[in-house]
A protein has these predicted regions:
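Signal peptide-directed extracytoplasmic domains
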Residues: 73-84
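Bacterial extracytoplasmic/cell-wall-associated proteins, especially those involved in peptidoglycan
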Residues: 84-220
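Non-transmembrane amphipathic alpha-helical segments
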Residues: 32, 39-53, 75
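Sec-dependent signal peptide cleavage junction
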Residues: 16-33
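Bacterial N-terminal signal peptides
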Residues: 8-17
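Charged, low-complexity interaction regions
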Residues: 47-65
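Short, charged, amphipathic alpha-helical segments
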Residues: 33, 59-72
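Positively charged n-region of N-terminal signal peptides that target proteins for export
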Residues: 1-4
Length: 220
């Protein structure tokens, strides 16, 4: 019985210690934690500045104290964004970045962000798979090839060859959506060059000079 209890306790201890290690192995999580710590340092500095100003006789309504408060608040917004982003894995980011590239890579930041947000809306909707990979590989929706490492590598190889930054630009749009920076109703679940679902939330026209299209973002 004693051996059984010891073994059980060891298993529990391993489980507790392995969770942070699993997260730490994910570079996105590690980067987000570092960014959060940086923002908290900024908050500490802003707080200390405000306190120092108050001791010197400045009121809370003074421009200097207000500037310190603004800095603290902006850091808090950034922390909230990084906390949301930290919930996604490297694989989630890679798959969605590849998807955004193929769906709207050479359009505008707005369109790229909207495409990413539609996918994230689907992840949160019970009618669709609850993972980024599941949404992208769902039959009849996007494309299973978007979920492959090879597809992402091909984009980056082209960037390296041509001196372009298409993958990075698409990744920025994906992270903006994951951080909650894209304004779109949660029930916008469709994106295509035609209207569908329960009506159009917004249509966006794009003309590159050699290619023109209208994208419809629709309620589901």
């Amino acid at each position: 019985m004693k051996k059984f209890l010891i073994a059980t306790l060891l298993c529990m201890a391993l489980t507790v210690t392995m969770v942070p290690m699993a997260f730490a192995a994910d570079s996105n999580y590690t980067e987000c934690m570092a960014a959060i710590q940086e923002q908290r340092t900024i908050q500490d500095q802003a707080h200390q500045t405000a306190e120092s100003l108050r001791k010197k006789g400045y009121s809370d309504s003074s421009a200097y104290v207000q500037a310190a408060k603004s800095t603290w608040n902006e850091a808090q917004k950034a922390i909230a964004g990084y906390q949301k982003l930290a919930q996604y894995s490297d694989e989630d980011i890679r798959i969605l970045t590849t998807t955004v590239f193929h769906e709207a890579g050479h359009t505008t930041e707005q369109l790229r962000q909207y495409v990413a947000q539609v996918v994230l809306n689907r992840v949160e909707d019970s009618r669709f798979p609850d993972t980024v990979k599941g949404v992208i590989t769902q039959p009849g929706q996007y494309s299973t090839k978007y979920a492959t490492v090879e597809a992402a590598n091909a984009i980056q190889a082209t960037d390296s060859k041509n001196g372009t930054y298409s993958y990075g630009i698409c990744e920025d749009s994906v992270k903006a959506a994951m951080m909650g920076q894209v304004e779109m109703p949660s029930n916008v679940l469709y994106q295509a060059n035609f209207s569908q679902g329960k009506g159009v939330w917004k249509s966006v026209y794009f003309n590159s000079g050699w290619y023109a299209s209208t994208s419809y973002f629709c309620y589901g």
